[in-house]
Design a protein with these regions (language model features):
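Exposed, flexible binding/inhibitory loops of compact, secreted disulfide-stabilized domains
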Residues: 3-8, 18-134
């Protein structure tokens, strides 16, 4: 009897673990059409979340049921002159992959001597996929 209970527990554990595992594919299926959102066009709820998080590097997503907004912030920087490049935005079988790069000010740039909090917000069509930030 005791062996039957132990075997049943092991089988249940294996079954439950297998059901919870979802394979995350990194194979690119298609590029995603997107636009970079100006600050005045960011939904208020999202803008408030950005303001709360901007001191430290952060990543977040926000949906209004029609569009999906992806945000990457690079935290406090000592000067102005930073820009953010979208390296990749594409889908796999079950994920959205979003990769960005922070570029610092150039040697010849006129630099604002004040702390800045660079972030980028992109808007794309809503997809119910997990977002992977790179």
């Amino acid at each position: 009897m005791r062996i039957t209970v132990i075997i049943s527990c092991i089988l249940c554990a294996v079954f439950l673990c297998a059901c919870g595992a979802q394979k995350v594919s990194d194979k690119k299926v298609s590029d995603v059409s997107f636009s970079v959102v100006n600050e005045e066009d960011i939904p208020e709820t999202l803008l408030n979340a950005i303001e709360e998080k901007k001191m430290e590097p952060f990543k977040l997503s926000y949906s209004d049921n029609n569009d999906l907004y992806l945000v990457v912030g690079y935290g406090r920087q000592p000067t102005g002159g930073y820009s953010i490049i979208v390296d990749e935005l594409y889908t796999t079988e079950n994920t959205i992959v979003f990769a960005t790069t922070l570029n610092g000010p150039g040697e010849k740039d006129i630099i604002q001597e004040a702390e800045t909090y660079p972030y980028i917000v992109v808007k794309m069509e809503y997809l119910d996929y997990e977002v992977i930030y790179k």
